[in-house]
Amino acid sequence: MPRYLGLMSGTSLDGMDIVLIEQGDRTTLLASHYLPMPAGLREDILALCVPGPDEIARAAEVEQRWVALAAQGVRELLLQQQMSPDEVRAIGSHGQTIRHEPARHFTVQIGNPALLAELTGIDVVADFRRRDVAAGGQGAPLVPAFHQALFGDDDTSRAVLNIGGFSNVSLLSPGKPVRGFDCGPGNVLMDAWIHHQRGEHFDRDGAWAASGQVNHALLASLLADEFFAARGPKSTGRERFNLPWLQEHLARHPALPAADIQATLLELSARSISESLLDAQPDCEEVLVCGGGAFNTALMKRLAMLMPEARVASTDEYGIPPAWMEGMAFAWLAHRFLERLPGNCPDVTGALGPRTLGALYPA
């Protein structure tokens, strides 16, 4: 059976996930590898997410470094598995999103797939999102089709919740097309706030948030953003939810303890997820969580409290480690492309119809 590699570097910018799958009737995870994002590269990518000078040259330089990291990760995983490049049919590379503005009909991921193919000796399938945008879609989320393939074959009303920098949900109802949308900020604001206040990259187990108290006036102000009231299809990114956005809201309120702000940001993530999910799928019986948020103990407990009628659990219970779900999805999307099969869900993204996503860069 063919083997594929998937590369994922998400909006949290903590590092790069490299996964190896085998694709038959089912998708099987064979191996995984992780490379932390170098601090300088992370900061330079973040700087590209907002308007600035000399963007074209800076983006070209940054993506050379991003590709070098990706190629290193591929080589290390293959070495660990004692495999050669010709044993891999293709790499599915998401690239690194630096702008996502579907309302303006564009999304931009850097990642120079031609150079990645050259450095690894493996065919690369990349540029998945723009095909959906070209068909009138949001270009995100793209993982619901993969979630459907993994978890949509029984009679359970189920949601698969990915909590990365942003949160998105796939709604799997028996006998119905898969639906899904972005819920809002996942970890992105909590990560930004703890880094701003304490120099840490994330709130381990949600412990700092758990030490504070939710400020309901601030929470109401944050939830008043029009994104939360919008119905799907919808997607979002750092262009909308970022540290300056939070600071604008904080300026309208009396000074608050930093831990209380973190607690309020965790509640924002939990509420935006639970309210949008239950509004769209009130009969949901099970919520399977993947992404970095699955490791945030405080957030998982809060989600379970807000959705008492549904069982909230990690995808680990089904043999899919939550950290590797998105990497697996883009390996699977590479397979879909090479077989000329659709990879999007029109009811999720709003595209005019099913489309084969991606473009091929031969080695």
UniProtKB/Swiss-Prot annotation:
Pathway as given in its UniProt record: Amino-sugar metabolism; 1,6-anhydro-N-acetylmuramate degradation; Cell wall biogenesis; peptidoglycan recycling
Pfam families assigned: AnmK
Disruption phenotype: Cells lacking this gene accumulate anhMurNAc. Deletion of this gene increases fosfomycin sensitivity. Growth rate is not affected.
Signal peptide: none
Gene Ontology terms: biological process: 1,6-anhydro-N-acetyl-beta-muramic acid catabolic process; amino sugar metabolic process; peptidoglycan turnover; response to antibiotic
GO MF annotations, alphabetized: ATP binding; kinase activity; phosphotransferase activity, alcohol group as acceptor
Domain of life according to the entry: Bacteria
Main enzyme class: transferase
InterPro entries: Anhydro_N_Ac-Mur_kinase, ATPase_NBD
Entry's EC annotation: 2.7.1.170
Chain positions recorded as ATP binding sites: G10, T11, S12, L13, D14, G15, M16, D17
Catalytic activity, as annotated: 1,6-anhydro-N-acetyl-beta-muramate + ATP + H2O = N-acetyl-D-muramate 6-phosphate + ADP + H(+)
Record key words, sorted: Antibiotic resistance, ATP-binding, Carbohydrate metabolism, Kinase, Nucleotide-binding, Transferase
Keyword Transit peptide listed: no
Role according to the record: Catalyzes the specific phosphorylation of 1,6-anhydro-N-acetylmuramic acid (anhMurNAc) with the simultaneous cleavage of the 1,6-anhydro ring, generating MurNAc-6-P. Is required for the utilization of anhMurNAc either imported from the medium or derived from its own cell wall murein, and thus plays a role in cell wall recycling. Contributes to intrinsic fosfomycin resistance in P.aeruginosa.
Stored HAMAP family: AnhMurNAc_kinase
Family statement drawn from the similarity comment of this UniProt entry: Belongs to the anhydro-N-acetylmuramic acid kinase family.
UniProt cross-references to NCBIfam families, sorted A to Z: PRK09585.1-3
Protein name: Anhydro-N-acetylmuramic acid kinase
Organism: Pseudomonas aeruginosa (strain ATCC 15692 / DSM 22644 / CIP 104116 / JCM 14847 / LMG 12228 / 1C / PRS 101 / PAO1)
